[in-house]
Amino acid sequence: MPINRIALGSHQEVYHPGALKAAFAEFISTLIFVFAGQGSGMAFSKLTGGGPTTPAGLIAAAVAHAFALFVAVSVGANISGGHVNPAVTFGAFVGGNITLFRGLLYWVAQLLGSTVACFLLRFSTGGQATGTFGLTGVSVWEALVLEIVMTFGLVYTVYATAVDPKKGSLGTIAPIAIGFIVGANILVGGAFDGASMNPAVSFGPALVSWEWGYQWVYWVGPLIGGGLAGVIYELLFISHTHEQLPSTDY
Protein backbone atom coordinates (compact mmCIF):
# COMPACT_ATOMS: atom_id res chain seq x y z
CA MET A 1 0.00 0.00 0.00
CA PRO A 2 1.21 3.58 -0.63
CA ILE A 3 1.03 4.42 3.08
CA ASN A 4 3.73 1.83 3.72
CA ARG A 5 5.96 3.39 1.07
CA ILE A 6 5.71 7.01 2.26
CA ALA A 7 9.21 8.20 3.11
CA LEU A 8 10.16 11.22 5.18
CA GLY A 9 13.73 11.26 3.97
CA SER A 10 16.43 13.20 5.79
CA HIS A 11 16.81 16.91 6.38
CA GLN A 12 20.28 16.52 4.86
CA GLU A 13 18.55 15.78 1.56
CA VAL A 14 17.63 19.46 1.36
CA TYR A 15 21.33 20.30 0.93
CA HIS A 16 22.17 17.49 -1.46
CA PRO A 17 23.40 18.83 -4.84
CA GLY A 18 21.02 16.56 -6.75
CA ALA A 19 18.02 17.74 -4.74
CA LEU A 20 19.02 21.38 -5.14
CA LYS A 21 19.41 20.96 -8.90
CA ALA A 22 15.99 19.33 -9.08
CA ALA A 23 14.44 22.14 -7.03
CA PHE A 24 16.04 24.76 -9.27
CA ALA A 25 14.60 22.93 -12.28
CA GLU A 26 11.17 23.13 -10.63
CA PHE A 27 11.68 26.85 -10.05
CA ILE A 28 12.54 27.45 -13.71
CA SER A 29 9.74 25.24 -15.05
CA THR A 30 7.13 26.88 -12.83
CA LEU A 31 8.39 30.33 -13.76
CA ILE A 32 8.09 29.46 -17.46
CA PHE A 33 4.59 28.06 -17.00
CA VAL A 34 3.18 30.90 -14.90
CA PHE A 35 4.86 33.62 -16.96
CA ALA A 36 3.33 32.28 -20.18
CA GLY A 37 -0.05 31.40 -18.68
CA GLN A 38 -0.55 34.61 -16.72
CA GLY A 39 1.11 36.71 -19.39
CA SER A 40 -1.21 35.47 -22.11
CA GLY A 41 -4.21 36.46 -20.02
CA MET A 42 -2.76 39.91 -19.35
CA ALA A 43 -2.01 40.43 -23.05
CA PHE A 44 -5.50 39.28 -24.06
CA SER A 45 -7.03 41.63 -21.49
CA LYS A 46 -5.00 44.56 -22.83
CA LEU A 47 -5.99 43.83 -26.41
CA THR A 48 -9.68 43.32 -25.72
CA GLY A 49 -10.36 45.43 -22.65
CA GLY A 50 -11.27 42.66 -20.24
CA GLY A 51 -11.40 39.87 -22.78
CA PRO A 52 -10.32 36.91 -20.58
CA THR A 53 -13.88 36.73 -19.23
CA THR A 54 -15.27 36.10 -22.73
CA PRO A 55 -15.55 32.71 -24.50
CA ALA A 56 -12.63 33.64 -26.74
CA GLY A 57 -10.59 34.58 -23.70
CA LEU A 58 -11.35 31.24 -22.06
CA ILE A 59 -10.22 29.34 -25.14
CA ALA A 60 -7.07 31.45 -25.37
CA ALA A 61 -6.29 30.75 -21.71
CA ALA A 62 -6.81 27.02 -22.18
CA VAL A 63 -4.53 26.88 -25.23
CA ALA A 64 -1.82 29.05 -23.65
CA HIS A 65 -1.74 27.02 -20.43
CA ALA A 66 -1.75 23.70 -22.31
CA PHE A 67 1.20 24.73 -24.49
CA ALA A 68 3.11 26.33 -21.62
CA LEU A 69 2.68 23.31 -19.35
CA PHE A 70 3.73 20.97 -22.15
CA VAL A 71 6.99 22.90 -22.41
CA ALA A 72 7.47 23.34 -18.65
CA VAL A 73 7.04 19.62 -17.94
CA SER A 74 9.27 18.67 -20.88
CA VAL A 75 12.21 20.83 -19.82
CA GLY A 76 12.07 19.63 -16.22
CA ALA A 77 11.22 15.96 -16.72
CA ASN A 78 14.77 14.61 -16.88
CA ILE A 79 15.96 16.66 -13.91
CA SER A 80 13.15 16.88 -11.36
CA GLY A 81 10.34 14.89 -12.92
CA GLY A 82 8.67 18.07 -14.15
CA HIS A 83 6.07 18.41 -11.40
CA VAL A 84 5.50 22.18 -11.83
CA ASN A 85 2.68 21.89 -9.28
CA PRO A 86 2.55 21.33 -5.49
CA ALA A 87 -0.50 19.08 -6.00
CA VAL A 88 1.48 16.81 -8.33
CA THR A 89 4.32 16.71 -5.80
CA PHE A 90 1.86 15.87 -3.01
CA GLY A 91 0.31 13.12 -5.14
CA ALA A 92 3.77 11.71 -5.74
CA PHE A 93 4.51 11.86 -2.00
CA VAL A 94 1.41 10.00 -0.83
CA GLY A 95 2.10 7.41 -3.52
CA GLY A 96 5.58 6.87 -2.12
CA ASN A 97 7.40 8.32 -5.13
CA ILE A 98 9.14 11.26 -3.45
CA THR A 99 10.35 11.92 0.10
CA LEU A 100 8.78 14.53 2.35
CA PHE A 101 11.90 16.70 2.51
CA ARG A 102 12.44 16.69 -1.25
CA GLY A 103 8.74 17.38 -1.73
CA LEU A 104 8.89 20.41 0.57
CA LEU A 105 11.94 21.63 -1.33
CA TYR A 106 9.95 21.33 -4.55
CA TRP A 107 7.06 23.26 -3.00
CA VAL A 108 9.32 26.17 -2.05
CA ALA A 109 10.81 26.23 -5.55
CA GLN A 110 7.39 26.10 -7.23
CA LEU A 111 5.96 28.91 -5.10
CA LEU A 112 9.05 31.04 -5.70
CA GLY A 113 8.88 30.37 -9.43
CA SER A 114 5.27 31.50 -9.60
CA THR A 115 5.94 34.59 -7.49
CA VAL A 116 8.98 35.67 -9.51
CA ALA A 117 7.04 35.15 -12.75
CA CYS A 118 4.26 37.44 -11.53
CA PHE A 119 6.69 40.12 -10.36
CA LEU A 120 8.45 39.98 -13.73
CA LEU A 121 5.13 40.30 -15.54
CA ARG A 122 4.10 43.30 -13.47
CA PHE A 123 7.47 44.98 -14.01
CA SER A 124 7.67 44.28 -17.75
CA THR A 125 4.08 45.31 -18.57
CA GLY A 126 4.15 48.76 -17.05
CA GLY A 127 2.55 47.74 -13.78
CA GLN A 128 -0.40 45.83 -15.24
CA ALA A 129 -2.07 43.68 -12.61
CA THR A 130 -1.78 39.92 -12.80
CA GLY A 131 -5.02 37.97 -12.88
CA THR A 132 -6.15 36.54 -9.55
CA PHE A 133 -8.51 33.62 -9.01
CA GLY A 134 -12.08 34.07 -7.81
CA LEU A 135 -15.53 32.50 -7.88
CA THR A 136 -18.24 33.34 -10.41
CA GLY A 137 -21.73 31.91 -9.96
CA VAL A 138 -20.66 29.06 -7.67
CA SER A 139 -20.40 28.63 -3.92
CA VAL A 140 -17.12 28.03 -2.18
CA TRP A 141 -17.99 24.35 -1.71
CA GLU A 142 -18.91 23.91 -5.35
CA ALA A 143 -15.59 25.48 -6.33
CA LEU A 144 -13.82 23.14 -3.91
CA VAL A 145 -15.40 20.11 -5.60
CA LEU A 146 -14.42 21.49 -9.01
CA GLU A 147 -10.81 21.84 -7.94
CA ILE A 148 -10.77 18.35 -6.42
CA VAL A 149 -12.16 16.70 -9.55
CA MET A 150 -10.04 18.66 -12.03
CA THR A 151 -6.83 18.09 -10.08
CA PHE A 152 -7.66 14.42 -9.65
CA GLY A 153 -7.81 14.13 -13.44
CA LEU A 154 -4.53 15.98 -13.80
CA VAL A 155 -2.55 13.92 -11.28
CA TYR A 156 -4.13 10.67 -12.49
CA THR A 157 -2.84 11.58 -15.97
CA VAL A 158 0.61 12.25 -14.52
CA TYR A 159 0.64 8.84 -12.88
CA ALA A 160 -0.62 6.99 -15.96
CA THR A 161 1.77 8.61 -18.42
CA ALA A 162 4.84 9.52 -16.36
CA VAL A 163 4.99 7.64 -13.04
CA ASP A 164 3.69 4.16 -13.85
CA PRO A 165 6.69 1.88 -14.51
CA LYS A 166 4.60 0.06 -17.14
CA LYS A 167 4.11 3.23 -19.17
CA GLY A 168 6.62 2.17 -21.82
CA SER A 169 6.57 4.36 -24.91
CA LEU A 170 3.54 6.20 -23.50
CA GLY A 171 6.00 8.19 -21.39
CA THR A 172 7.14 10.08 -24.47
CA ILE A 173 3.75 11.79 -24.75
CA ALA A 174 3.40 12.47 -21.01
CA PRO A 175 4.10 16.23 -21.23
CA ILE A 176 1.57 16.79 -24.00
CA ALA A 177 -1.05 14.62 -22.27
CA ILE A 178 -0.55 16.61 -19.06
CA GLY A 179 -0.84 19.88 -20.97
CA PHE A 180 -3.98 18.70 -22.73
CA ILE A 181 -5.81 17.71 -19.53
CA VAL A 182 -5.04 21.09 -17.99
CA GLY A 183 -6.27 22.91 -21.10
CA ALA A 184 -9.45 20.81 -21.17
CA ASN A 185 -10.10 21.41 -17.48
CA ILE A 186 -9.71 25.16 -17.96
CA LEU A 187 -12.49 24.97 -20.54
CA VAL A 188 -14.58 23.19 -17.90
CA GLY A 189 -13.88 25.23 -14.79
CA GLY A 190 -12.38 28.48 -16.01
CA ALA A 191 -15.70 30.31 -16.11
CA PHE A 192 -16.58 29.24 -12.56
CA ASP A 193 -13.46 29.41 -10.40
CA GLY A 194 -10.57 30.02 -12.79
CA ALA A 195 -9.58 26.33 -12.88
CA SER A 196 -6.35 26.56 -10.92
CA MET A 197 -5.52 22.88 -10.22
CA ASN A 198 -2.22 24.22 -8.94
CA PRO A 199 -1.61 26.03 -5.63
CA ALA A 200 1.50 27.71 -7.05
CA VAL A 201 -0.45 29.18 -9.97
CA SER A 202 -2.92 30.85 -7.60
CA PHE A 203 -0.34 31.76 -4.94
CA GLY A 204 1.95 33.94 -7.07
CA PRO A 205 -0.74 36.33 -8.36
CA ALA A 206 -2.33 36.51 -4.89
CA LEU A 207 0.97 37.46 -3.28
CA VAL A 208 1.92 40.06 -5.88
CA SER A 209 -1.52 41.71 -5.82
CA TRP A 210 -2.10 40.92 -2.12
CA GLU A 211 -5.58 39.57 -2.80
CA TRP A 212 -6.19 36.41 -0.77
CA GLY A 213 -9.91 35.82 -1.28
CA TYR A 214 -10.79 32.10 -1.36
CA GLN A 215 -7.09 31.23 -1.54
CA TRP A 216 -7.66 28.20 0.69
CA VAL A 217 -9.92 26.66 -1.97
CA TYR A 218 -7.01 26.64 -4.40
CA TRP A 219 -4.86 24.79 -1.87
CA VAL A 220 -7.26 22.36 -0.24
CA GLY A 221 -9.02 21.30 -3.46
CA PRO A 222 -5.90 20.50 -5.51
CA LEU A 223 -4.15 18.78 -2.60
CA ILE A 224 -7.17 16.54 -1.94
CA GLY A 225 -7.57 15.75 -5.63
CA GLY A 226 -3.87 15.13 -6.16
CA GLY A 227 -3.57 12.99 -3.05
CA LEU A 228 -6.57 10.87 -3.99
CA ALA A 229 -5.22 10.29 -7.48
CA GLY A 230 -1.84 9.23 -6.13
CA VAL A 231 -3.30 6.79 -3.60
CA ILE A 232 -5.86 5.29 -5.98
CA TYR A 233 -3.43 4.79 -8.85
CA GLU A 234 -0.78 3.27 -6.59
CA LEU A 235 -3.29 0.95 -4.90
CA LEU A 236 -5.12 -0.26 -7.98
CA PHE A 237 -2.76 -0.09 -10.92
CA ILE A 238 0.88 -0.25 -9.81
CA SER A 239 2.15 -3.62 -8.66
CA HIS A 240 5.02 -3.68 -6.19
CA THR A 241 5.23 -7.45 -5.94
CA HIS A 242 7.58 -9.60 -7.98
CA GLU A 243 5.83 -11.74 -10.58
CA GLN A 244 7.75 -14.81 -11.70
CA LEU A 245 8.22 -15.03 -15.44
CA PRO A 246 6.69 -18.09 -17.10
CA SER A 247 9.21 -20.88 -17.60
CA THR A 248 10.33 -21.72 -21.11
CA ASP A 249 11.74 -25.00 -22.37
CA TYR A 250 14.81 -24.65 -24.58
UniProtKB/Swiss-Prot annotation:
Domain comment quoted from the record: Aquaporins contain two tandem repeats each containing three membrane-spanning domains and a pore-forming loop with the signature motif Asn-Pro-Ala (NPA).
Keyword Ubl conjugation on entry: no
Organism domain of life: Eukaryota
Keyword terms, alphabetized: Membrane, Repeat, Transmembrane, Transmembrane helix, Transport, Vacuole
PANTHER family, sorted: AQUAPORIN TIP1-1, AQUAPORIN-8
Coiled coil: none
Motif placement: NPA 2: 198-200
Record-level GO cellular component terms: membrane; plant-type vacuole membrane
Pfam families: MIP (PF00230)
Molecular-function GO term, any one: water channel activity
The protein's role, per its UniProt record: Water channel required to facilitate the transport of water across cell membrane. May support the rapid influx of water into vacuoles during cell expansion, permit osmotic equilibration between the cytosol and the vacuolar content and rapid transcellular water flow through living cells. Its function is impaired by Hg(2+).
TM regions (residue ranges): 24-44, 56-76, 104-126, 143-163, 172-192, 218-238
Tissues of expression: Expressed in roots, shoots, leaves, tassels, ears and embryos. Expressed in meristems and zones of cell enlargement: tips of primary and lateral roots, leaf primordia, and male and female inflorescence meristems. Highly expressed in the root epidermis and endodermis, parenchyma cells surrounding mature xylem vessels in the root and the stem, phloem companion cells and a ring of cells around the phloem strand in the stem and the leaf sheath, and the basal endosperm transfer cells in developing kernels.
Family according to the record: Belongs to the MIP/aquaporin (TC 1.A.8) family. TIP (TC 1.A.8.10) subfamily.
Mode of membrane association: Multi-pass membrane protein
Originating species: Zea mays (Maize)
Protein name: Aquaporin TIP1-1
Localisation per UniProt entry: Vacuole membrane
One annotated GO biological process: water transport
